[in-house]
Structure formats: structure tokens, C-alpha cells
């Protein structure tokens, strides 16, 4: 097989992927990297659940992997990279963020724009959102929860009166597309980047649409020869 898609245990997929498929030479920790919606398109959240004890060198590689993926799979030229922080200033953040920041500034091959606060992520201020897995997973789950709540609230609000029902009919096409962008199943799963093969982790509660889109991800990944480009472009030492 050229690819593996699973909605099973994240831990089992991580261990199996590294032991059976193996890491690309020089990759320290393969991260999970799902696409998330933004005001003008999508961003890549990396890492969202694979490495809760990440080191600065890991986050630098996440930035490189994310840039390669966004440019070659999503088609974003010279993608902007930001690191999740509690403020925009360079001196803010925990020890991990403070140690990683100067490394990202010095890293060639990426377009680092600095710290990004969580509230700015949906605004599309960057194309690659770098974090360790704990923070990334919290962001991802909040996205999923807010998206599901928003869709539910809008649908129920449209049925409250005859006027709202008529209004809903008038804006239905545009509204449908907008709400679709908040549906996590539209983006497929999260590729485990940095492996010698292609492994995609879908949500444990995935429906048929998400599995289908995860398979489409695999096709795009394979067609664009992402692993070959990672091997060619990854900078192993900072």
C-alpha cells in the first residue's frame, strides 16, 4: 500500500508509524498536522497531538515540515509561519517558546512572522501555526467545538419564525458554503509528517465524508511527492 488511513487510537498510530514505516532520516519527532479554517482559507496546525514533550529543535522542524506541506499540497507560496504564544512580543511565553523563537528567526527556508495569539489564528494571520502537542490539541478541539456549535445555532436560528425562514432561503447558497468551512469533516485527517510513508490520522468519530477526504489527502500527498521534497528541503541542524 502507498498510504495508511485510520480513525483508531492516536498512540497506536504514532507508535506503529514510527516502528513499521520509520522516520525520514534526520526527523526527530513526526508531528500531526491538520488543516483548520481561517477567514480567507486554511492554515496548518502543527503539532496537534503527537509530541507533548517537544523541544525547541522539534518545533523548528515542525515549521519546516509545515512550510513544505502548505506550499506543495495546499499551494500557498512562501507560507507565513507563526508560533503560538500568549502575546505578540518576543520576550513573552513559556521556556519552550522563548527558546524556540530565536531559532525560528534564524532558520532559513521558512518565512517566520513571529508570535501568534490564539485569537488571531482564525483571522488567517499565518499559514503554518507551530505549537507543541498539548497546546495544539486544545486549539484543535476548541475549533471543532465552536464550529459544531456555530452550525447548530445558525440552523436553529433560521427556524424561529416565518421571516427567518424566508431570509434563510434567500441566503442559503452562501450560508451553506460558509457553514461548510466550519465542518471539520471537510478537511480530512491529520497527516503524520516526517515518516518514510504516508500515514493519516482521522478523528475517532469520523463520518464517511472525513474518511473520503482523508483518502483524497493521501492522493494529493503522493502526487506532489511530499516525502521526496521533505528529504530535499529539510534543514537538519540549526
Listing of model-derived features with the role each one plays in the protein:
Residues 52-118, 127-128, 132, 144:
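Glycine-rich phosphate/diphosphate-binding loop of Rossmann-like nucleotide-binding domains
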Residues 13-14, 121-123:
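Short secondary-structure boundary/hinge segments and terminal tails
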Residues 1, 50-55, 115-122, 186-187:
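Glycine-rich oxoanion-binding loops at beta->alpha junctions
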Residues 18-31, 37-45, 125-129, 133-238:
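Glycine-rich phosphate/nucleotide-binding loop
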Residues 4-6, 45-51, 80-87, 198-202:
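Short glycine-rich or small-residue beta-strand-to-loop segments that form or flank ligand, phosphate
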Residues 2-3, 8-58, 62:
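Glycine/threonine-rich beta-strand-loop-alpha-helix active-site module
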Residues 9-12, 86-89, 118, 134-137, ...:
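Short glycine-rich anion-binding loops that position phosphate/pyrophosphate groups of nucleotides
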Residues 13, 17, 63-66, 100, ...:
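Buried hydrophobic packing segments
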Amino acid at each position: 500500500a502507498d498510504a495508511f488511513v485510520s480513525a483508531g487510537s492516536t498512540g497506536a498510530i504514532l507508535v506503529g508509524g514510527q516502528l513499521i514505516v520509520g522516520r525520514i532520516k534526520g526527523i526527530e519527532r513526526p508531528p500531526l498536522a491538520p488543516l483548520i479554517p481561517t477567514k480567507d482559507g486554511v492554515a496548518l496546525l502543527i503539532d496537534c497531538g503527537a509530541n507533548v514533550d517537544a523541544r525547541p529543535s522539534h518545533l523548528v522542524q515542525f515549521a519546516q515540515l509545515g512550510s513544505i506541506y502548505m506550499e506543495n499540497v495546499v499551494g500557498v507560496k512562501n507560507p507565513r509561519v507563526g508560533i503560538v504564544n500568549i502575546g505578540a512580543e518576543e520576550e513573552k511565553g513559556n521556556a519552550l517558546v522563548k527558546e524556540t523563537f530565536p531559532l525560528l528567526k534564524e532558520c532559513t527556508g521558512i518565512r517566520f512572522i513571529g508570535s501568534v495569539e490564539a485569537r488571531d489564528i482564525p483571522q488567517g494571520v499565518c499559514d503554518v501555526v507551530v505549537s507543541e502537542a498539548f497546546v495544539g490539541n486544545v486549539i484543535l478541539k476548541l475549533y471543532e467545538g465552536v464550529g459544531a456549535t456555530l452550525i447548530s445555532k445558525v440552523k436553529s436560528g433560521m427556524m424561529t419564525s416565518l421571516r427567518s425562514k424566508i431570509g434563510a432561503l434567500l441566503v442559503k447558497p452562501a450560508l451553506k458554503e460558509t457553514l461548510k468551512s466550519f465542518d471539520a469533516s471537510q478537511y480530512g485527517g491529520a497527516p503524520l509528517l516526517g515518516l518514510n510513508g504516508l500515514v493519516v490520522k482521522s478523528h475517532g468519530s469520523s463520518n464517511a465524508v472525513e474518511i473520503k477526504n482523508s483518502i483524497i489527502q493521501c492522493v494529493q500527498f503522493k502526487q506532489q511527492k511530499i516525502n521526496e521534497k521533505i528529504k530535499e528541503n529539510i534543514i537538519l541542524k540549526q
